[in-house]
């Protein structure tokens, strides 16, 4: 396995937190740490009149979050490579910190074409 790609839909979140760029930035830093990932770079952007996007470049891949405070919604991707990281823990932290009352998590296993072919043969 190359890694895990978690796709997280956060609904009914705290709209004030969703619109707070500093809070989103700190929360992404916390998520990368709890996942056991190494944060290389982090950029955020505050939109007018509302919304924040944050992108974290990890040594193991990335975390992205896009918020819509007016809808109480955030779209999150957490992709980590290798067996040592825990993207599901990052997702759980994001659910808790953004106070999501309802969420959906899909986890995809990422493999190389050779690994996929071998799995189909076996």
From Swiss-Prot:
Catalytic residues identified in the record: 61, 66, 81
Keyword S-adenosyl-L-methionine: yes
GO biological process, any: spermidine biosynthetic process
Pathway assigned in UniProt: Amine and polyamine biosynthesis; S-adenosylmethioninamine biosynthesis; S-adenosylmethioninamine from S-adenosyl-L-methionine: step 1/1
Record InterPro entries: AdoMetDC_C, AdoMetDC_fam_prok, AdoMetDC_N, S-AdoMet_deCO2ase_core, S-AdoMet_deCOase_pro-enz
Post-translational modification: Is synthesized initially as an inactive proenzyme. Formation of the active enzyme involves a self-maturation process in which the active site pyruvoyl group is generated from an internal serine residue via an autocatalytic post-translational modification. Two non-identical subunits are generated from the proenzyme in this reaction, and the pyruvate is formed at the N-terminus of the alpha chain, which is derived from the carboxyl end of the proenzyme.
UniProt remark on cofactor binding: Binds 1 pyruvoyl group covalently per subunit.
Function in brief: Catalyzes the decarboxylation of S-adenosylmethionine to S-adenosylmethioninamine (dcAdoMet), the propylamine donor required for the synthesis of the polyamines spermine and spermidine from the diamine putrescine.
Subunit structure comment from the entry: Heterotetramer of two alpha and two beta chains arranged as a dimer of alpha/beta heterodimers.
Record protein name field: S-adenosylmethionine decarboxylase proenzyme
Natural source organism: Prochlorococcus marinus (strain MIT 9211)
